[in-house]
Regions:
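Signature of alpha-helical transmembrane segments and their immediate interfacial
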Residues: 1-30, 439, 510-570, 597, ...
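Hydrophobic alpha-helical transmembrane segments in multi-pass membrane proteins
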Residues: 12, 16, 213, 343-352, ...
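Hydrophobic transmembrane alpha-helices and their membrane-interface caps
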Residues: 23-29, 34, 350-419, 459, ...
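Membrane-proximal juxtamembrane linkers immediately C-terminal to transmembrane helices
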Residues: 31-47, 82, 130-137, 501, ...
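Membrane-helix entry/capping segments
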Residues: 294-298, 304-351, 383, 391, ...
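Helix-loop junctions and hydrophobic alpha-helical segments within the transmembrane domains
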Residues: 327, 334, 338, 342, ...
Length: 672
């Protein structure tokens, strides 16, 4: 194989350049995330049944949908939530490896079968089916600090003007509104209803009859009478808009000619569709929020950038006083983490180059293994793209680890060629041919042995297997590419770059005269270390039992400390944000929940001024469910550069918050 490419060096370069181009293209296409997608793909179904209790929603909506979803191909399990605000949510989890698009289509087909069995109100409002990750990528908040807009204004604007735009952003899987649109609220007076002998259904029927969209047709439309001189579309007042118009809706005509109207038995006012949420930003300013879920397999960084670009464009048309904020954003940590790993990768390449130059003492010989590094790394990115993986912490860490391994094959080729040139006096091309005949089998064997160490990780089960499968495949693919480059490109480089040694080997060690003395000193030092090591090994061989006992002791201590080390699924890291989950006793009101959230907010904004940048409180929902007794506080911390000392890290902030929050009575508070 090596002889084939030695006779066709241009072909070898074409292959190497092709591998690099494939890698460059793959880098621009690969999604970027902190970790591989651990959770299996899931499809969420959401619906609203306004006015219904949690039990009613469970019986009339959730159970009907669940019964129709049984038998879905590759579905593992279902989970559902319903609350007293009339919200139903069903999560369908599929087996790992399932195509989310196919799963979404199957769920849609099954849902159509369930629709006729659902309450009419639920059918009219519709059900949303989304394929997205479970965790929020970021939260977009609209706030007003000058008091010109209240929470109802912000919520209506968020849903009517912003939500649809963000849902169309590439990479966004779902936009969950922590808000409600404007709606006409009809407050019934039960005493007046009794006096008039009416029921709430009479009010509903009257509103449906008079608040309708009417198409009035055209004036002078075809076929027209002879001599028609005008054609125009007739416009009439359709949907009612003001409380006065709703109040004037007739409900019943009495025998005496009088009319009972809505205003006679109820009060109409403009409000929000539902009052489940109560949001405040920083020092109690009203807010509305949109939670962004990333589409499965999308690039997290690009998605966040696209969302912010869309908000920047929309902000040009904001009402006076409205501002946008991002109280929760996971992408800065991903960006910093990947940047740190890339920095480590570059440092590792530089260190490998310096170490090779230190030991080889020849810039030409050092360049050859160095050229192999970008070819193999970029080729590995292409392999990741083929497998459908992402650029994440584990794949990048695997590349950092692989750098020290992938240059070994090229170094073996270079050193053997130099040895043959020195001992047998052959020219570079002939020496390379003879060298490759000698070591081709060894190179393949080395690659297989090292790859075999990581093969078992590919077969780990569960979430651990999902995480470390990408790690192992990254290293294995880089090792295989390293062997291929050592057989294809490295011999061509040796034949063209290496030169026979000069008669004065000492003088030919380096072309840089100032470094000659350094390399002479280093070689002498290295030879002394080598001789000392040989003497130590000879001494150890004379006293086998004591050293075997020392070895056994080291192994025992290693096992002892390994068993005492704390374990964890993934390392705890300062991600630049905190989340506090609040749960009050069942039956608690929204007002009580807001009081607790205000105490939490005041602690972080007043006692943690050095670390906290902004804060968003949300009453009415949490990760545990929805309801007046639920709440959350999103805390965004300042940049890591401003929090260098240990007491300013996220773990220390949580440690200080726990005793303070534990003193708040009648609430369970979990800062994470």
């Amino acid at each position: 194989m090596a002889r084939f490419f030695l006779n066709r060096p241009v072909f070898a370069w074409v292959i190497a350049i092709g591998i690099m181009l494939a890698g460059v293209i793959a880098i621009n296409m690969l999604p970027v995330s902190q970790y591989p997608p651990i959770a299996p793909p899931s499809i969420s179904i959401r619906g609203m049944y306004p006015g219904a209790s949690a039990k009613t929603v469970e019986d009339t909506v959730v159970q009907v949908i669940e019964q129709n979803m049984t038998g879905l191909d590759r579905m593992l399990y279902m989970s559902s939530k319903s609350n007293s605000m009339g919200t139903a949510q069903i999560e369908l989890t599929f087996a790992p490896g399932t195509d989310p698009d196919m799963a979404w289509a199957k769920v849609q087909n099954k849902l159509q079968l369930a629709m006729p069995s659902l309450p009419e109100t639920v059918q009219r409002l519709g059900l949303s089916v989304a394929k997205s990750t479970r965790n929020f990528l970021m939260i977009v908040a609209l706030t007003c600090e000058d008091g010109s807009l209240d929470q109802d204004d912000l919520m209506d604007y968020a849903i009517s003007q912003v939500q649809t735009t963000l849902a169309r952003v590439p990479g966004v899987g779902e936009v969950e509104a922590l808000a409600a649109q404007y709606a006409m609220r009809i407050w019934l007076d039960p005493h007046k209803l009794t006096n008039y002998g009416m029921t709430p259904s009479d009010i509903i029927a009257g509103i449906r009859t008079h608040n309708v969209q009417v198409s009035a047709g055209q004036y002078g439309g075809t076929p027209a009478v002879p001599g028609q001189r005008l054609n125009a579309t007739i416009t009439v007042q359709n949907l009612l808009k003001t409380p006065e118009e709703f109040g004037a809706i007739p409900l019943r005509n009495n025998p005496d000619g009088s009319v009972v109207r809505v205003r006679d038995v109820a009060r109409a006012e403009l409000g929000t569709e539902f009052s489940q949420f109560k949001l405040t930003y920083n020092d109690g300013h009203p807010a509305a929020a949109l939670a962004i879920r990333q589409m499965a397999g999308a690039n997290a960084l690009d998605t966040a950038d696209n969302v912010k670009a869309a908000m920047e464009e929309l902000s040009r048309y904001f009402p006076a006083g409205m501002k946008v904020a991002y109280p929760n954003d996971t992408t800065p940590f991903i960006r910093v983490a990947i940047s740190e790993v890339v920095h480590t990768l570059i440092v590792a390449i530089i260190l490998v180059f310096l170490v090779m130059y230190l030991f080889l003492g020849n810039i030409r010989a050092t360049i050859i293994p160095t050229i192999a590094v970008p070819v193999v790394i970029l080729g590995t990115f292409a392999v990741l793209s083929v497998f459908g993986y992402s650029i994440n912490m584990l794949t990048m860490f695997a590349m950092v680890l692989a750098i020290g391994l992938l240059v070994d094959d090229a170094i073996v080729v270079v050193e053997n060629v130099e040895r043959i040139m020195s001992e047998e006096g052959l020219p570079p091309l002939e020496a390379t041919r003879k060298s490759m005949d000698e070591i081709t089998g060894a190179l393949v064997g080395i690659g297989l042995v090292i790859s075999g160490v990581f093969v078992p990780m590919m077969f780990f089960g569960g979430s651990t297997g999902i995480i470390y499968r990408q790690f192992s495949i990254t290293i294995i693919s880089s090792m295989i590419l390293s062997v291929l480059v050592a057989l294809i490109l490295t011999p061509v480089l040796c034949a063209n770059l290496l030169k026979p040694e000069a008669p004065d080997h000492e003088a030919a060690e380096t072309r840089f005269r100032p470094l000659r003395s350094f390399f002479r000193w280093f070689n002498r030092l290295f030879n002394r270390v080598r001789d000392g090591y040989r003497s130590a090994v000879a001494h150890i061989l004379g006293f086998k039992l004591p050293y075997v006992a020392v070895f056994v002791l080291i192994v025992a201590l290693t096992g002892f400390f390994f068993m005492r080390m704390p374990t964890g699924y993934l390392p705890d890291e300062d991600q630049g944000a905190l989340l506090t989950i609040v749960q009050l006793p069942p039956g608690s009101t929204q007002e009580q929940t807001v009081e607790v959230l205000e105490k939490i907010r005041d602690h972080f904004l007043n006692n943690e001024k050095e670390t906290v940048q902004e804060c968003l409180t949300v009453a009415g929902v949490s990760s545990a469910g929805g309801g007046q007794d639920q709440g959350m506080v999103y805390i965004k911390l300042k940049d890591w550069d401003l929090r260098n000392s240990p007491e300013l890290k996220a773990e220390a902030i949580v440690g200080r918050a726990i005793p303070v929050l534990a003193a708040i009575r009648n609430a369970r508070i979990y800062p994470v």
